[in-house]
Amino acid sequence: MLWSHLFIPTLRENPAEAEVISHQLLLRAGYIRQLSAGIYSYLFLAQRSLLKIQQIVRQEMNAIGAQEMFLPALNPAEVWQESGRWDIMGDNMFRLKDRFQRDLCLGMTHEEIMTVVARGELRSYKQLPQIWYQIQTKFRDEARPKSGLLRVRQFLMKDSYSFDMDQAGLDAAYEKHYKAYCRIFDRCGLRYTAVEAHSGAMGGSQSHEFMVASDAGEDFVVTCAGCGYSANLEKAVSRPVAPDRPDPEGDLTPEPFHTPGRKTIAEVAEFTALPESSQMKSLVLVADGKPVLVMLRGDHQLSETKFGAMAGDMEFRQAHPEEIRTWFGADAGSLGPVGIKNMPIYADRALEGRRNMIAGANRNDYHLRNVTLGEDFEAEVHDLRQVAAGDLCTRCGSTLAVQKSIEIGHIFKLGYKYSESMGLRVLNAEGKEVTPIMGSYGIGIERILSAAIELYHDKDGMILPSAIAPFDVVVTPANNSDEAQMTAARRIYDECIALGLDALLDDRDERPGVKFKDADLIGIPYRITVGKKLAGGMVELVERKGKATVDVLVAEAARTVAARAGR
């Protein structure tokens, strides 16, 4: 292709609205343009990269026996109502009505629709197992779209679904996807980690996320350098570090003391000259319309994901100030578990074994000393705290680290959540009706591109891996008016094409510096510069990564790039 014929609208400055590196460079390099909040047009270069990513995904999905389909993005409400997710998805789902006032939605994922297809067609164990997939546009009504292609309202996703007769079959399908995802992300040139994850609204018994460490990410991954343990922050477990000072010994009786105007854990710690870890934190939640008291160590945070997993199907929220006042007779900041009999109390495991701690007295401006779980109040104990950097690994005792990350893929063992609720049945070998077991597996196509840019860039632009760059090589004559340079450049370009390289000839009538800056900006892995060294039969080969430059013979230029690019 000739650059002079292409639409590549590069920018010299970072757009003001772009905060993360990938967003800045995608705009500056002319890959994307914003239509509305969270909605982008993919221009020529972006489309080339995204198609390459999709091709890699297709090849690896086909290799595990998955069959590509294409399902409707416009879904009737009743299908989502069957699974119960019409209400669960809330404001995240785009909803609309047709001219007959029937409810519809734009699909965010396709578990329900795939199950409908299976329900209508699968009859016998002889038709299983099945793996079906699609690469399709999805829609999610994000409250605050941001970070370019990382949090959008319209996006491309590869979603696949497995149907098996039993748990062993699901385990095999899950393992196939796990390995296929590793091959996909390896081929795309990403550095990633597969971590244990929470299934959330998807449901199911097990899931893994594939994460790329990046400050642009909105997820957090907990890792242990000692044993390799890794998990999403929502799922991670740990041993908290010991309290900052030992608890007072003895069987002491709770006693109130005046804490005027001290409402926060930090304020009480300063007032008492005791560390936050010597206090109990009281949180009031409303679960299915009823109050619940949650107790944590003062320096710990509640994991709402863990609480939700413990609560099961209960819907919960934080209590409002007026509700707290009605139930406790005091305001938040003065609450505690002693004397509470009218609601369930849940305590985090970190409070087990602790003695004589400080808690609210359920009286404004007062707290209690000497509060002990199991003696002064009873509670149901669970792992409810959010892991923090510096905690200890439960497997090996090493210190845990927490890193912001970008989620690029997620796989789930769904179990029977959808097949059971939506009435999918087949006959087994004995002629008995049984319910198939399902898995669900997703990859964010644009997220792969954004993650690659976050990983690989410098002050001059993107440094894209060859497998997903829009072009493998750009051939750049330094002086368009030099006939010898143009002839050699066209010859090298033609040889690159013949070797199967995606080549671009920069035939624009621009200064060499402009051409070089644009090539660096858009992330082409190799540049062949045809300049003054042509008189000696040589051209410059510049590798975008590290800017390493070597002189090669004109006749060897195309073959050298092909060898380095793995063609």
Summary of predicted features, one role per range:
Residues 1-98, 161-200, 299-300:
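TRNA-binding/sensing appendages of the translation machinery
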Residues 1-28, 113-145, 258-263, 459:
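Charged, low-complexity intrinsically disordered tails and linkers
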Residues 54, 111-119, 144-160, 165-441, ...:
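Extended, low-hydrophobicity, polar/charged segments
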Residues 75-79, 323-326, 507-514:
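Short acidic loop-to-helix transition motifs that present clustered carboxylates
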Residues 87-105, 212-223:
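Acidic, His- and aromatic-enriched active-site or binding-groove loops in soluble protein domains
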Residues 268, 439-468:
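C-terminal, non-catalytic macromolecule-binding modules
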Residues 461-515:
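Generic long, charged, amphipathic alpha-helical segments
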Residues 493-552, 556-559:
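C-terminal structured "cap/appendage" subdomains that terminate the fold
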